[in-house]
Amino acid sequence: MNSPRRTTLRITGDTPRRRGEDRGRQARAGITRAWRVYEELFATVAAGNARTLDVPALALRTVRATRAWAPELVAEMEGVAEGAGMPFWTIAALNARTEILAEAGAPRTGECSTLVRTGPRTTGGQCWDWHQELADAWHLQTVTGDTQGFAGITEHGILAKIGVNEAGVGVLFNILGHTDDAATGVPVHLVARQVLGAAASFAEAVGMLTGAPVSASTVITVVTADRAASVELAPAGSAVVAPDDRGWLVRTNHFLAPALAAGELRGRREAETYDRHRLLTERVLTHDGGPGTDASAVSDAETYGWEASGSEVSGPATPDAATPGPDASHGVAPGPSALGPDALVRLLAAHRDDGAEVCCHAPVEGRLGGRWATLATVAVDPAERSLRVHGGGPCSAGPETWTPLTAPRR
């Protein structure tokens, strides 16, 4: 079950521009390769929906929104372009790939599944599913020089995706789909980057997310040592979704907040997101000691040193009320272990024969845009400011396949 070790970029720089230049220089070849795939993907998806895309114009439109919200992110992308020797609009397009694909009418079969367990030691993780043709277009990273140092995974040329920062603020990432999605606002990947580089607390992270003027939908799950919440973002607004009464957050690729679910696009097109959500909700009940309890769940604490730390209640909540703090654990039923790597892969390793394809495998043949795979499995432990990353789906993970990352000090 050995998986190849991923490149880890150590990004440094005392200004956004310098951090971008450092990223561009280090990832130059990978950015060039990734752009070629995305350029073809944009065109293929648009053609399949009888649409024509002006990708430079769309990318620069998102830049204008970003400059108004967080100009330092634009400066960082400008640095990436310079370091990589690429036109600026191509780097902007990579960071706005979710928004541009929304304009193209992209189907999102596969996508991501996330689990978080709150309690005395809140932990979580996810499958990151994307196009098989981009399986080599991502890397691990540590970033210093911003307000908060952070670590995580991202795609070549994209500033951030999944990660945790030195303040112990982690973010997990699931794309959603809304009828109003477009490429006019701040790209969701840049919103995640802003949280990782600036948020010093759970409340700050949630405040940044709910204040971001996005134009494409996503749910970013904020995880700290003692609390968690999913923040649903859409052109129609935002909503904070609290854990259920057992302390669990189960996320796939549809809205849970009723006000935003009225504009649901993904679930109407592809009901498999509901199948994954239903299966995972059943599995976490088993993990917590329900019918068919998995007694081997204690092995995570022994194997990885993660201590012990529970379907869905949705709706707006204030940042400080989204989950109980360490001294207010009423209503949360602590189970046999934290959600470390071993427990995470047992819960996420599900295929079609199990009732839903949480762990995705690409078909051998097929066109670009239709070959989805789980490219990475990520476990996050905010109390330790750390992640563990497995290159591939949870069904291929083992103790020796995880790469540990710790958020650096700025």
Label each region the model flagged.
Residues 96-190, 375-378, 387-388:
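Internal mixed beta-strand/loop scaffold within catalytic domains of large alpha/beta enzymes
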